A protein has these predicted regions:
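Short amphipathic alpha-helical interface segments
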Residues: 2-29
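N-terminal glycine-rich phosphate-binding loop and ensuing alpha1 helix
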Residues: 14, 30-31, 69-126, 130
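A short, conserved structural fragment
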Residues: 46-56
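Conserved alpha/beta core of the MobA/IspD/sugar-nucleotide pyrophosphorylase nucleotidyltransferase superfamily
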Residues: 65-76, 227-299
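Conserved beta-loop-beta/alpha segment of the NTase-like Rossmann-fold superfamily
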Residues: 134-205
Length: 299
């Protein structure tokens, strides 16, 4: 059984808040859908045996969880090969994702969020001082480490090429994002999307929305969405990504950021949504000065 978008959003919310008191307004507010529409869709879901409402408690049934499985995120690919030169001297002897921020490694905030969402198939593509990532195995014994031997000769598209065959219903994540709100990583996703927060003006990488989908990916923009390096790709889009990455990379496109392929060069092949988050959900630490402002031990 295929779910409509509204049905998915309702069930996704309910499964993350199992056995909650039935409050139509709360559901409506959380998923940004009118109460009337939520009520209508809940009636359909209940008649289909996907949700159960009894004694003012609402929950997703076992059958409902089976239906949600088709939207399950299967794995996460984390790109961690870069040097992080702007973070020197903190990155002199370790990669940026392993830098401690208030006694927590940056990458741990992402790994903990993934594991909390029951996404345990995690591949980390390493490069600069790649052997240092072995220390993660003590806390995260199931992660897989894959080395990109040409990380310093190409852009991060080469890291994607290193694990190309593993693209399938997966998150693609940058490793140097400090996750303040782990709930931005969810177990289920309906369609291909990229995290973004609304901004009146930015000098950083950003995009706009056109008919509901990402458009005008560029550096610097107004009335736009800041690009955050956490995206999800469906099975169908993963297949297209594999073909498009191969075509671009094998024809001299070794110096592209990987996201340029689906968002710019081959954008007509994709319809990628913006999954909105708040600026405070993710902390981007771009340089050593910003690190000092967040963690006084570096001053």
């Amino acid at each position: 059984m295929q779910l409509t978008r509204y049905q998915f959003e309702i069930m996704n919310y309910l499964q993350s808040n199992q056995n909650c008191f039935f409050d139509l307004r709360s559901i409506s507010d959380k998923i940004c859908v009118s109460s009337a529409l939520v009520s209508q869709q809940l009636e359909i879901l209940e008649k289909s045996g996907l949700v159960d409402l009894s004694d003012k408690i609402i929950k997703v049934t076992e059958r409902g969880l089976l239906v949600l499985e088709q939207y399950r995120v299967r794995k996460a690919i984390i790109l961690a090969a870069g040097f992080g030169s702007r973070m020197l001297p903190a990155t002199k002897d370790k990669p940026k994702p392993l830098v401690l921020v208030n006694n927590v490694r940056i990458i741990d905030t992402l790994l903990d969020a993934l594991i909390k969402a029951e996404i345990n198939d995690i591949v980390i593509v390493t490069g600069y001082k790649g052997d240092r990532f072995n220390e993660l195995l003590n806390k995260y014994p199931t992660i897989k480490l894959v080395n990109n031997p040409i990380f310093d000769k190409t852009n991060n598209i080469s890291s994607i090429m290193t694990v190309l065959n593993q693209l399938d219903c997966c998150y693609i994540c940058e490793a140097d994002l400090y996750i303040s709100n782990p709930n931005i990583i969810t177990k289920y996703q309906y369609c291909s999307n990229i995290l973004g927060s609304y901004s009146l003006q930015t000098d950083d990488w950003s995009f706009k929305m056109n008919n509901g989908f990402i458009d005008q990916y560029q550096k610097g923009n107004t009335y736009c969405y800041n690009y955050y390096g956490i995206s999800f790709w469906t099975r169908d889009d993963s297949i297209k990504l594999k073909n498009d990455f191969k075509e671009v990379y094998n024809n001299g496109g070794t110096n592209y950021f990987w996201e340029f392929i689906p968002l710019v060069l081959k954008k007509d092949n994709y319809q990628v949504e913006i999954r909105q988050c708040q600026k405070e959900d993710i902390m981007e630490i771009d340089n050593y000065y910003e690190l000092q402002q967040i963690d006084s031990s570096y001053k």
